[in-house]
Amino acid sequence: MKRSYNKIAFNLLVGCLMAAALTACGTKKAALNTQHPTPNTQPSTPNTQQTTANSQFVKKVHDNAVYAKNITAKIDFSIMRGDKEISVGGKLMMRRDEVIRIQLNVPLIGMEAGRLEFTKDYVLIVDRIHSEYVKGDYNQVDFLKNNGLNFYALQALFWNQLFVPGQTKVTDAMLKLFTAEILNTQQPTPITLEKDNMKYTWLANSQSGLIQRVDVDYNSKSSGSTHVSCEYADFKAMGVKSFPNSITLNMQTTAQLPAGTKKMPKNMKLGIRMKSVDNDSKWDAFTTVSKKYKQVSVDDVLKKIMSM
């Protein structure tokens, strides 16, 4: 009975991870612009001191980025997909500009069940229960490629930072691409960036400049809409900076999937609660998959996910 429960739980968990990691895959066949659009760079009309204050605030938010090269932590990982919910333990291991890895344990037992690994060049998902793995290129997903969404955008979400789609980092010169509007020092200040069908909104504490939430909105007449929000809480000191020890990802979508595929749940929620956060550097950045493991396609995995 316990073994059956663990298998079901793990299947659900891997399925939700894949759906979260490949949210856009359901729309990858949609007719999107094949050219790489550039961010909206038209500056707003200057308004003297207010414009200067807004620009200074964007710079303050940008400067809040932590200096650490490595961030590691034990985590409590929870996910709700449709009416199904599960919580497990695991590890989060991140090395700046190299990798983001989430390792998850089998419920009740504690052994590693699988891992989700993002690098600059690929996404790797290892299923240790069934000795299978998926390895995909970001360029294989048209939605991600056409909208400049890559490893560095995902890294910025996990590291609580601003990002510019299609860029590897945000330079001081790029800060003019962001639009901030300080409305009330007692309320979070929105910082926005628009790119084709995408709109990004960072909500930052008007006094500290710490990013409390990110909203990503995608709207397309041909393939539906998707809203993703990432909320940050429990900020704790990391050197001279602060880093959120709690990350909650929410997704709502009306994305159209390939014919014959079950509809994607309209709502999905993923939570990562960090414990024992450290800057340990003594670990290998990249996973080597055993030759005994079978490589399966993204399409095969998506079919399994949507059939749950």
Question: Which residues make up each language-model segment?
Answer:
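C-terminal motif of bacterial Sec signal peptides marking the signal peptidase cleavage site
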Residues: 20-24
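Flexible, processing/modification-adjacent segments and terminal tails
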Residues: 57, 129-200
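Solvent-exposed loop/turn segments connecting transmembrane beta-strands
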Residues: 81-85, 106-113, 196-198, 222-224
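An acidic-aromatic
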Residues: 29, 99-156, 298
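Edge/loop elements at the starts and ends of beta-strands within beta-rich repeat scaffolds
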Residues: 63-71, 81-86, 93-98, 116, ...
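Gly/Pro-enriched, hydrophobic low-complexity segments
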Residues: 170-294
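Bacterial N-terminal signal peptides that target proteins for export
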Residues: 2-13
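N-terminal leader/targeting segments and the immediate start of mature chains
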Residues: 25-86, 298-308
